[in-house]
Amino acid sequence: MKILMTSASIPMVMDLAVELNSMYHLRLTDKTAMSTGMEFVRSDLGHGTETNELVSGMDAIIHSGYANPSDSESVQLDYQMRCTYNLLWAAWEERVTRVVYLSSLKQMDRYDEDMAVTERWRPMPRSDARSLCYHMGEYVCREFARELKVKIVCLRLGDITQNGSEPESVSSLYVDDAIDAVVNALTYDATGWDIFHIQSEVPNERYLTGQPWCSSGELSVSLGYKPRPRSSA
């Protein structure tokens, strides 16, 4: 399977890419030129033939909603709205049928911790650029999927934590669990627009995982993700 991964300069994306590189043929991209040791194509994800050439021949795209904090807020939001739209449009034109959008559980953390928050709950993003970027990126993806242009699986990830480290929060997500979720999303029998909450098994874990997703009034199967047992849990 040939997979394009965006935002290669983001450490979380590179952590995933290093592991996925042994399973798939990866092409990485970012607006900043960089050396990765893997196939890399610099791209601004503009509305032109360059983005079509970038996605041409890919079987799937893993697109990150994480915004570079060194960019201005307007640049961060522009990337998640305009550039995400450009990427999905090119994917549709080039007949890429699968996109995995990496979002965040941060959109859900305004709910009280004693609530059993699932994927059916409405996101409540904060007013900061990082939270709004995830929210607006999801919005663009959802509208594309609703028009049946591309099948999109949205993974709301917990706080990325290196394997073997102490959990950073009650919604921590270890890298190996994140890899498992992404691999499942790449082969999941997507309905068009599917959302799944992903976190690891940690003490007092906050979010439910492994839930089925309700799309167009019908209950679909779960992603099949199960967090790995942790000795510290």
Positions of predicted regions on the chain:
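Glycine-rich NAD(P)-binding loop of the Rossmann-fold in SDR/ketoreductase-type enzymes
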Residues: 46, 75-86, 94, 128, ...
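Conserved C-terminal active-site "lid" loop/helix of NAD(P)H-dependent oxidoreductases
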Residues: 195-232
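NAD(P)H-binding glycine-rich loop region in Rossmannoid oxidoreductase-like domains
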Residues: 35, 42-81
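Conserved Rossmann-fold NAD(P)-dependent oxidoreductase catalytic core, especially the SDR/UDP-sugar
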Residues: 86-127
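Alpha-helical substrate-binding/gating segment
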Residues: 146, 157-162, 172-196, 201
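Catalytic helix-loop patch of NAD(P)-dependent Rossmann-fold dehydrogenases
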Residues: 112-152
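Flexible, glycine-rich beta-alpha linker
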Residues: 107, 129, 147-169
